[in-house]
Amino acid sequence: SFQAGLSWECVLNKREAFRRAFDGFRLESVCAFDEAKLHALQQDASIIRNRRKLEAAVRNARVFRDIQQECGSFSSYLWGWTNGQVLREFGPTSSPLSDAISADLKKRGMTFVGTTIIYAYLQAVGVINAHSPTCYRAGAVPLYPTPRP
């Protein structure tokens, strides 16, 4: 959610500060953040302090947890959209799949999860292999995922 409207470089340069501020990204910890914690985060100059994005991170963590409970894991939720198949696409920054997942996550209550951000996430976790067929890494992404909890 923090990347929305910013460069990936900006967010990645703050990765360790985010890890510290968000308790190592432990889901239950982030889900429990309250108003006092959000206020403290707004004072932390080492992270992105946009109030709406901070609130979204907590809300999104809670929705993420709900999806885990509903589907067994967030991985199962994502791979359910492709019946466990890796999609090979090269070039776009969004797709009908990222449109659908973005819409579903928004319907569930997440924010700052637009189709471009979801598309990038799907690439990062291996649901979409966006390597050009001539790229030396094109074959490195497995055709079938290894299920993870």
Task: Pin down the residues of each PLM region.
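HhH-family (HhH-GPD) DNA N-glycosylase catalytic core used in base-excision repair
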Residues: 1-149
